[in-house]
């Protein structure tokens, strides 16, 4: 399925143009609105992401607010999560761009209103709620602050902060969580795979067929790319987002060939009889390797191969004729070492003989560590033997051949391969990546933190579920070596931290955990990204921060900044998330004010 060919200049150009077209359409063709500095955005990529994509109780709550004339009172909500996924200590935030598109286009269509009126829960509801309120509702009074997409984030820190009329802000909850939860989970999963595989390996996403539905497949391709994957097999995702697309053939292609007559057209470049040349090459390869007395290989049986599967050779020739400059063969249909690799080498050498450059092989089953090492060793010996026979085109075969491995690869498999040793250049990863099999949900929540400018707190027997009240400022403080030290939350009107000035950082709930930090750099995390009153998304924020390639680059840069102990798989060190001294005192006082004292008898 996957081809590890390096992306051509044409592909890169197409990807860049595709991304630019997408961003221009997102900005409504780049036209300025009447405020000049704010943008009206295009709809979400998935046309199901509308105002109606919500839970019924959001409608009933909005009705109750409206019925009690509370719907226009100003409320603030935080989108946050409480625990990092996959047993790790970091998360990649994604989904902001789609959230802003959703806000930009939030309204109930006439047919949406008519449908809601027919719902069972609407029987007791005043029709004026639908005709006068829901029919006119939009995000023109909403303000959204968000962290830049692709940022490494941590529990409790708000990813998105929504302020506006209570009725509208409540109606945004379900869809915002839908757009952020899965996107952040997949991007985090992809980033973890990239960390485990290392920077040199190519990571190829091909989970479309295993994804949870059509949108699950397209979204997974998009956010896996943001998280650090190099390409996808998903053509629709490639078209939508300009992601490089790779692909070769499946086992069925090999099985579909049985006779040389199946190949219609045998000419490749200056080679008039490619199939005949490939058969002769296989014959010479067998003779050269079996008669070699100076083999450096410890696996003599590997080099002394017998008859290979002819139908497999036929299929390889057919594919090489179709794609002489990007030939990558799946070699495990019958027997990887006894048939697949000898057949591949014969066809690859024939291509090289006539001036073409084949790409490599893919292994989709078996012991990937052992097989990759044996495949590489076979090519080294084949190259040496053919060079001794005066064939200069064999030189470089082993070095330039890319070995791609697939077969239910996940983080654990990648670590085991690294420990045992392998010769794999690229990994095709599907099921475990797109389904997030290790953890199927991130668990973002949407919590009311302020009502009519008065902070609100949600209490729980589980201290992890206690919210940090009020509208907050959020900052990341960096040390002298450039690494982030702590994320700190402040009350809305507190003085911002400054470089070189000590900041008291306190654990939100444990009194004894506190420290002074003197930052060498201060980064503001929550930025205004939607200003409904002024007409939309701030142009400066959009142009500097939004876009697939910007988010992808941000992930790479941010992960490199983090201390390695925060990123490691085994017993990672939790990153510090703190509150200011003022916010700590306020939170705990509000906690006491809202917690009834027990009566003891």
Whereabouts are the PLM-identified features?
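Ordered alpha/beta subdomains of enzyme catalytic regions
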Residues: 2-4, 13-325, 338, 350-352, ...
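Short beta-strand/loop segments at the ligand-binding rim of alpha/beta enzyme cores
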Residues: 139, 378-406, 424
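Glycine-rich beta-to-alpha transition loops that act as phosphate-gripper elements at the mouths
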Residues: 147, 209-211, 403-411, 430-432
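Catalytic beta/alpha-barrel core
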Residues: 161, 329-334, 358-367, 402-406, ...
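Short, surface-exposed connector motifs at secondary-structure boundaries
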Residues: 323-328, 353-359, 394-401
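Catalytic cores of alpha/beta
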Residues: 339, 409-423
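Conserved structured catalytic cores and adjacent interaction surfaces
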Residues: 347, 361, 368-374, 378, ...
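Glycine-rich phosphate-binding active-site loops on the catalytic face of alpha/beta enzymes
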Residues: 423-442
